[in-house]
Amino acid sequence: MTAPTTAERIRSACARAGGAMIAVDGIDPTTTPVHHLLCDGSFAVTVPSAGRLAASVATAGAAGVQAVLEMTDYAPIALREPVRSLVWVQGRLREVADRDVSELLDLIAASDPNPALLQVHSDESRYALMRLEIESVVAADSTGAESVAVGDLLAARPDPFCAMESCWLQHLESDHRDVVDRLANRLPGALRRGRVRPLGLDRYGVALRVESDGGDHDVRLPFAAPVDDVTGLSRAIRVLMGCPFLNGLRARRV
């Protein structure tokens, strides 16, 4: 395999999504500071407790309302087009019963200690906790759009490097342009005339964005085999660079 599955890409996007909105017919899209995939195949989301969306869901009761959660995965560097991918989750949005809120907050906080959780069901409550029962999931990026079954989504895991990816890409862009240039040497000649930027990094390879007068082009450089730790990642990048020193003290650190 030379690239993550769509389900893996969605799980990684869920883990690092820099922006998420939830939309319901007749109401302006609402920011959701918490959007957490639960093991039962639903999403826990928070919405402003004093907003129209919270009131609409409360009025609907057990029936809930049809809603779409949109998560945006932004590049961690200043690209001309910063959005790397979008994920849309459609389903029924319902309130979480008061008796279940505390337990669910603890469950979310165990893996995602989001500060917004402290503002749910508290003395200074700003957000209401809701559950989105998934009916469909679609992801889109520069290669196209694809739907994913909920079972596949639950079976997948985020990329092991997704929590560190932003810092690494920023480091490559600001301090190691020589590494980016070496990677760019693997691109077709026509693409090398554009400005090459680091776009993504995962266990399967490196993605580059080429910004040119003719538009943007995303190119993936796969590793020879997937890697699972920082040592393997560093070695795989050196192989892509064509570095002759793959081991020992003379190996370049990236």
Across the structure, where does each feature detected by a protein language model lie?
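An N-terminal domain-cap segment
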Residues: M1-T59
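Catalytic micro-motifs at enzyme active sites that drive phosphoryl/nucleotidyl and oxygen chemistry
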Residues: R9, T30-V34, Y74-R80, A116-H121
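A general structural signal for short secondary-structure junctions and capping/turn motifs
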Residues: R11-C14, A58-G61, L79-R80, V120-E124, ...
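Coil-to-beta-strand transition motifs
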Residues: P29, D40-A44, R84-L86, R203, ...
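Short hydrophobic-aromatic micro-motifs
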Residues: S42-P48, L69, V89, R94, ...
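Short, structured beta-strand-loop surface elements
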Residues: A50-P113, D216-D218
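C-terminal edge-of-domain segments
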Residues: L105-V254
